[in-house]
Amino acid sequence: AEEYLKMKQYQRKIKNITGFKPFPGTLNLRSSKEEVKNTLSQVDSIRISSFSFEGEEYSGVDVYPARVQGHDAAVLRMDVTDYGPEVVEIAAKHKLRETLDIQDGDKIKVDVKNQFQSESS
């Protein structure tokens, strides 16, 4: 998703949905395939349809509202990805790995919610 999040077309669409301009990269978390499926099935996503730009085709993505340890975020489920269904890609306004001082192997709480709301600043 990093390549996509660097593109203004995705940034604009995600900002329109989430209210924040996403950092151009994702925090990738691993869970069980069943847990990911069960959690995401409980909330509605907002769909970004696939599109063409400068002769290239770009994948659609389902965007789910979430919070990661107090920070507004979005779970991104790309139609085309290098990861399996057990990997969750999370976009946020900031680089969550640095903001939350996350190390490989850390357990992270992700709350998937029913709607996006702005972070208070």
For each feature predicted by the language model, list its residue ranges.
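Long, compositionally biased stretches
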Residues: 1-84, 104, 110-111, 116-121
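Active-site glycine-rich loop that binds ribose-phosphate moieties when present
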Residues: 10, 91-92
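Short alpha-helix capping/helix-loop boundary micro-motifs
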Residues: 92-98
